[in-house]
């Protein structure tokens, strides 16, 4: 004879959960990113949200940039995030690569003024093919300048200079003195927040 199933009221899992509105950091306009659900606010910590930069700054030309944020604070039904990285769409990057030109990548690791560990991938797209010595010099310029700027500023300043393109413009000016350049982009970043913020 089969055992009887226990009887009693079952609590619907969804009814035990609450919805939270998620917002981007202050330096990205504290824009509403969407809703997320949890049965305990502590379970929201570290949850990752993504959004195209075009939606955050109301600029359609930024649709190829994907921003990543992690929830680091919850107040009431609002969850606030910190920037943890960005990435340019691969299709967009491929469109910048032309025949008889060079693509020069460099990865720069630094700790920002406010203690965030950052890994930034910077890419230079030339107008004509660069030889090995020129590529070495270009890579050195990109690495040195990003390293200096990143270490001397807080993460928010670094992020804003990526968003508005100022960092890429300054790098472009430097590199074009050495070799004809079509474009310079910070194509990807990955951030490890200080433990107090994570």
From Swiss-Prot:
A GO term for molecular function: structural constituent of ribosome
Gene: rps3ae
Domain of life from the UniProt record: Archaea
Keyword tags: Ribonucleoprotein, Ribosomal protein
InterPro entries: Ribosomal_eS1, Ribosomal_eS1_arc
The UniProt record lists the keyword Cell inner membrane: no
Listed name of the protein: Small ribosomal subunit protein eS1
Xref: HAMAP family: Ribosomal_eS1
Family label: Belongs to the eukaryotic ribosomal protein eS1 family.
GO cellular component, one term: ribosome
């Amino acid at each position: 004879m089969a055992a009887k199933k226990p009887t009693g009221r079952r609590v619907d899992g969804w009814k035990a959960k609450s919805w939270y509105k998620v917002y981007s950091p202050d330096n990205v306009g504290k824009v509403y990113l969407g809703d997320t659900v949890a049965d305990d606010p502590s379970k929201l910590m570290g949850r990752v949200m993504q959004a195209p930069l075009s939606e955050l700054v109301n600029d359609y030309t930024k649709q190829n940039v994907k921003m990543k944020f992690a929830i680091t604070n919850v107040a009431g039904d609002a969850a606030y995030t910190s920037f943890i990285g960005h990435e340019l769409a691969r299709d967009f990057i491929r469109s910048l690569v032309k025949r008889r030109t060079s693509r020069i990548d460099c990865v720069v690791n630094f700790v920002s003024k406010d203690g965030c560990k950052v890994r930034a991938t910077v890419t230079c797209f030339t107008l004509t093919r660069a030889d090995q010595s020129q590529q070495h010099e270009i890579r050195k310029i990109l690495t040195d300048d990003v390293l200096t700027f990143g270490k001397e500023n807080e993460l928010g300043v670094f992020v804003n200079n990526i968003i508005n393109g100022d960092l890429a413009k300054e790098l472009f000016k430097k590199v074009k003195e050495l070799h004809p350049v079509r474009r310079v982009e910070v194509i990807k970043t990955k951030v490890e927040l200080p433990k107090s913020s994570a």
